[in-house]
């Protein structure tokens, strides 16, 4: 598969992995999920098996199956399907990277290993290069998330000269609040050869001002439409409207963070908003409480984020 003609830009939903109540992957709802993202949220790019997708809580076999289902269900509907293939060992990452190429994914991403950690830039690039080489036809993205990995190598340091060592390198998923580091990445990218995708949803407008080319996030599963309105306002240089959208989104995110917000709660919110059952998380995570879901629902309604009649009634959207 050749590199896509279009660079990855705009909103990218970090997809949830739907599960049954007994913890098995609920493959049959993924087609419905694709239709919901495209038709209801206006989101046509996805990031599969990342943090939101509990990728590192799945077996290699499960990760392969999940990737296949998203690619198959997204064909002729989604613009780009990027598969996260990061793992704690290079062999698993290489296997998943090769598989992503075989099934027709549009790109791969890799997070830094976080048990035995790379101690410097060269060591990390050596790991990333070996994984990228397993899928030489696919665009390669580095998934920068130091809060989860504990790897403190700055993204701007990593970007310096990276394409000389990883020819397929096409960009960065930057999930950190360090806007100085992100700004230096943008400054290096003056020819706009890389996709610089911001990963902190509640700070997206700040990143857009600095030059982000897109965003990857969990809230775009259910707040994609509102966030797209913010992007449109920003592109039209209507900063007042863009700020209004960002502040409304922040009110919700700030509220649920105070309640305790993570993958489990994201699954509960997505089930509530979309009507598609996301199920519980995989252990060691625990299911969101009914109290959390009720409070999140009330906040969504107060912000007019629950507007679809089918959503308010809790009815799943028909699968196309």
UniProtKB/Swiss-Prot annotation:
A single GO molecular function, which one?
Answer: N-acetylneuraminate lyase activity
Chain's role: Catalyzes the cleavage of N-acetylneuraminic acid (sialic acid) to form pyruvate and N-acetylmannosamine via a Schiff base intermediate. It prevents sialic acids from being recycled and returning to the cell surface. Involved in the N-glycolylneuraminic acid (Neu5Gc) degradation pathway.
What interactions and quaternary structure are annotated?
Homotetramer.
Q: What is its EC number?
A: 4.1.3.3
Q: What is this protein called?
A: N-acetylneuraminate lyase
SMART domains registered for this protein in UniProt: DHDPS
Which Pfam families is this protein grouped with? DHDPS
Q: Which residues are recorded as modified (Phosphoserine)?
A: 308
Task: Cite the annotated pathway.
Answer: Amino-sugar metabolism; N-acetylneuraminate degradation
The reaction(s) catalysed by this protein are: aceneuramate = aldehydo-N-acetyl-D-mannosamine + pyruvate
The protein's superkingdom reads Eukaryota
Q: What keywords tag this UniProt record?
A: Carbohydrate metabolism, Cytoplasm, Lyase, Phosphoprotein, Schiff base
Q: What is the lineage of its organism?
A: Eukaryota, Metazoa, Chordata, Craniata, Vertebrata
Q: Which SUPFAM superfamilies match?
A: Aldolase
For this protein, the record's InterPro entries field holds: Aldolase_TIM (IPR013785), DapA-like (IPR002220)
Residues spanning the membrane:
none
**EC supergroup of this enzyme:** lyase
Q: Where does aceneuramate bind?
A: 51-52, 175, 199, 201-202, 218
């Amino acid at each position: 598969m050749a590199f896509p003609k279009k660079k990855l830009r705009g909103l990218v939903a970090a997809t949830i992995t739907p599960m049954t109540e007994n913890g098995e992957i609920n493959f049959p709802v993924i087609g419905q999920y694709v239709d919901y993202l495209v038709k209801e949220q206006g989101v046509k790019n996805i990031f599969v098996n990342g943090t939101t997708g509990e990728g590192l809580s799945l077996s290699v076999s499960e990760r392969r199956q999940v990737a296949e289902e998203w690619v198959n269900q997204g064909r002729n509907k989604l613009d780009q399907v990027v598969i996260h293939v990061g793992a704690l060992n290079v062999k698993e990452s290489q296997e998943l990277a090769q598989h992503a190429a075989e099934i027709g994914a549009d790109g791969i991403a890799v997070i830094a290993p976080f048990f035995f950690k790379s101690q410097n830039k060269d060591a990390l690039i050596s790991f990333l290069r070996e994984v990228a080489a397993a899928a030489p036809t696919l665009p390669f993205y580095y998934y920068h998330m130091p809060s989860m990995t504990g790897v403190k190598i700055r993204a701007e340091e990593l970007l310096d000269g990276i394409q000389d060592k990883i020819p397929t390198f096409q960009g960065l998923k930057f999930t950190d609040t360090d806007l100085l580091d992100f700004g230096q990445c943008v400054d290096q990218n003056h020819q706009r050869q890389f996709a610089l995708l911001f990963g902190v949803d509640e700070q997206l407008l700040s990143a857009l001002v600095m030059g982000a080319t897109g965003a990857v996030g969990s809230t775009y599963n259910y707040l994609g439409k509102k966030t797209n309105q913010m992007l449109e306002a920003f592109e039209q240089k209507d900063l007042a409207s863009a700020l209004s959208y960002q502040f409304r989104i922040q009110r919700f995110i700030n509220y649920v963070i105070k309640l305790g917000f993570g993958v489990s709660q994201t699954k509960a919110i997505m089930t509530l908003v979309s009507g598609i059952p996301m199920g519980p998380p995989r252990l060691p995570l625990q299911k969101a409480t009914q109290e959390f879901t009720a409070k999140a629902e009330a906040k969504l309604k107060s912000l007019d984020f629950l507007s679809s009649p089918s959503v308010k009634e809790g009815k799943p959207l028909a699968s196309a």
